[in-house]
Each structure stands twice: as structure tokens, then as C-alpha cells.
Amino acid sequence: MSEELSKKHTTRLNKLQKRLRREVGSAIADYNMIEDGDRVMCCLSGGKDSYAMLDILMNLQQRAPIQFEIIAVNLDQKQPGFPEDILPAYLDKLKVPYHILEKDTYSIVKDKIPEGKTTCSLCSRLRRGTLYGFAQRIGATKIALGHHRDDIIETLFLNMFFGGKMKAMPPKLLSDDGANIVIRPLAYCREKDLEEYAQLKQFPIIPCNLCGSQENLKRAAVKDMLNQWDRQYPGRIETIFTAMQNTAPSQGVDREQFDFISLKRDPDVPMTGDVAEADLPAFDFLDIANSGHIDLDAAQRIDVVSFYEA
């Protein structure tokens, strides 16, 4: 690499690294993901996202005003051709404590899922169960997963389009049995930034298609839709994510989230008009004799059109 290219590479890496660290720090602070004394189990798949998560968390560990442990964990699911030496060599170099778990979930998935069908759903459930159980064994107080902002938004639309639910991936989650807290430190990070970061850092990526599973076509379609929006309408994806953080149950239609049944008007409220009219002169009657016009100051006159049955 020439000196000029090397300088550009370093400049871009530093800029991107700063942004990602800031976003991860903000997500952790906003959702209180990591606390003093935590033992964080960082789940590694060998993909770009989990590598970036471990890298950023290790940097944060050195700079944060609190003390917490990091234990990297990878689950070898016995997929054909899985390069067993890559992750141990990488983690040894980092000098981070780690565990490589071995469990043949691949055979279970191949036995249960018909040939040519997507295996990702069952595979992820089996993987989650194994990792949750191991977290309890090692006394982990938090389980860190590498899902990013795009994953969260895609999941929202997948559940809307195909599940009839307004449901995404929360940045912080208590497992159904109450035994584990799952955190997603990359919740504010864009996938394209993580892709570039992985290239610049030259992480030893392990391909995710070793199982031979077909691509999840529904998720791929949603991803394509969002990418098209991002190209055509810059800022739309950011607005969607902001909207997900600003929900108003009373303005929706979900009876489980808001008690519409018990809504009662307050007969004692003064007749001052609706909040939307707060900036307009208040009035409490219509001057029928004057064709519906109410005589106010000329500069503030309001025309009120009324219809009356004969």
C-alpha cells in the first residue's frame, strides 16, 4: 500500500472508529446496558458485526469509568467446512478470555427442515438456547449480541408485513424465563458502517452460508426495500428509527397498550377550546344573528361557518 493510500486508510478508519464508538457508548448509556461489575458474554459468530462489537467493547472497557469483564463465546454448530482455527487464533492474539462451545445443531436442523428451505429460524433458536444456558453456567450478567440498527428496523417491517405485529428487536431484553439480560450495543450503528469497518480492520470473516441454507427471502426483500428508500429518500431510515423511539400508545389502536375503554370526558374543564386552538382568541358562543361572524378585533377576526337545519 502506498504512503498516500495508507494515510487515507488510517484517516478513514479513525473517523469511522470514532463514530461507531460514540454510537455504542450512547446506546449503552441510553439503555443502561452495562453496569459496574458486569460480566458480559460477547457472542461471536465470526461475522463482521460480532467482530466489531467485541472490538468496540474492548476499547470501551479500557476507557469507561466503570469496571466490567468481557468473555467472548463462539458456538461451533458443526457446519461442514467450518474453519475451527480462525476464531481461537484471533482471540488468542487479542488476549481476551473466551470459550468455544461445540454442539451439533447442524444435524438437528437438517433433519427437521426440508431440503432447500431456510434453516435460519430453527438454527437461531437452538443457538440461543445453548448460549443462554452457558451464560448462566459462567455467571454472565449480560449477553451481548451483534444486531445493528438495520437489523432492528428490518425486524419491525418483517413483523408488520408477515406477522401482523408492531414488534422489533429491543436494545435490551429480559429473557422469557427471567434468567438472562440480552443487550445489543450496536443498536445505533448502521450496517454499511460496520461493513466498512470490518474491511478496514481486516477482521478474519467466517462466511455464514456454510450450512447451505437458502437466503431468508422475506428479510432480503425488506432489506432491499429499505435500501431503495435510503437511496431515494435520504434520511428516511433515520426518521423511521427515531419514530420507533417516540411511540404514542394513546394515538394508536392497540387496546392492550392503552385503556381506550375507560376514557371519560371531564365535564368541569373550562370552555377554552381544544389545545390546537391555543393560539387563537377564545370564544364560547356563535353570533347567529350576525351570519356566524363573531366580532373580535379586526386583526384577529375568525370566520366560523355553521350549518343549521330548518
UniProtKB/Swiss-Prot annotation:
Cofactor list: Mg(2+); [4Fe-4S] cluster
GO MF entries: 4 iron, 4 sulfur cluster binding; ATP binding; magnesium ion binding; sulfurtransferase activity; tRNA binding
Signal peptide (from-to): none
Location relative to the cell: Cytoplasm
GO biological process annotation, one example: tRNA thio-modification
Statement: the UniProt record of this protein carries the keyword Cell inner membrane: no
Annotated transmembrane regions: none
Cofactor: record remark: Binds 1 [4Fe-4S] cluster per subunit. The cluster is chelated by three Cys residues, the fourth Fe has a free coordination site that may bind a sulfur atom transferred from the persulfide of IscS.
Keywords: 4Fe-4S, ATP-binding, Cytoplasm, Iron, Iron-sulfur, Magnesium, Metal-binding, Nucleotide-binding, RNA-binding, Transferase, tRNA processing, tRNA-binding
Keyword Lipid biosynthesis part of the UniProt annotation: no
Recorded GO CC terms: cytoplasm
Pathway: tRNA modification
Catalytic reaction(s) noted: cytidine(32) in tRNA + S-sulfanyl-L-cysteinyl-[cysteine desulfurase] + AH2 + ATP = 2-thiocytidine(32) in tRNA + L-cysteinyl-[cysteine desulfurase] + A + AMP + diphosphate + H(+)
Further comment found in the protein's record: The thiolation reaction likely consists of two steps: a first activation step by ATP to form an adenylated intermediate of the target base of tRNA, and a second nucleophilic substitution step of the sulfur (S) atom supplied by the hydrosulfide attached to the Fe-S cluster.
Function: Catalyzes the ATP-dependent 2-thiolation of cytidine in position 32 of tRNA, to form 2-thiocytidine (s(2)C32). The sulfur atoms are provided by the cysteine/cysteine desulfurase (IscS) system.
HAMAP family found in the cross-reference section: TtcA
Name this polypeptide is given: tRNA-cytidine(32) 2-sulfurtransferase
Species name: Shewanella sp. (strain W3-18-1)
